[in-house]
Amino acid sequence: MQNSKRRRWRLGAVFCVLVSILLACGVREHGPWTETFDEAGDWQVSADAAASVTVADGVLRIHVFELGQVAWAAAGRTYSDFRLTVEATQVSGPDDNEYGVLTRMAGDTQFYVFSISGDGYARIARYNNGSWSILGPDWVPSDVIHQGAAPNVLEVEARGGTFVFSVNGTQVLQVEDAQLTKGDIGLYAGAFNEANVVIDFDNLEVQPLQ
């Protein structure tokens, strides 16, 4: 695991640079949802010199070509309180990476980030109008995260200002934060000192909570 201050600085910098290139079009109110990525649907597939998002062979794949870059795709759906699960698999690339889920997104200005790394760390952060905040411990190690080229099941439960982040059925972080109340969801991946991070996402499920 690399120095957490370096990782945090890079996260803020690269999101500001690339945030607009891979957003899906439109935001709609939705209920329970299952996504198996048999087709692109509302997910915007796109590519530039830094990264690509594709939907093929039953997965959404994010390939980050350049070091120090992050890319995402948004679903174009609005949720407030919900439980989300998704299978995320590091296909190739360095373990010093990050990938995960974005929630309560308002375009490129506001969102929560639920992250794991290929070397076994987890974190929750918030981006709000140009300001980054780490919620809870910064890059906490967890033995439940499958390291390297392996699948992990990510689960995010958002209920009011309480967020629970679980990996492979075990809670790794719980935080309180009431700044963002609803918004879109997204999937993302990022590279740090080495390029060519490839992450596949599949079997996304979202269940609204009462």
Regions flagged by a language model, labelled:
Residues 22-24:
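C-terminal motif of bacterial Sec signal peptides marking the signal peptidase cleavage site
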Residues 26-47:
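Extracellular carbohydrate-recognition regions
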Residues 37, 202-206:
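Extracellular beta-strand elements of beta-rich domains used
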Residues 51-70, 122-123, 188:
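Short carbohydrate-recognition loop motifs
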Residues 64-129:
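Secretory/extracellular carbohydrate-interaction modules
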Residues 175-200:
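Flexible glycan-contacting loops in extracellular carbohydrate-active proteins
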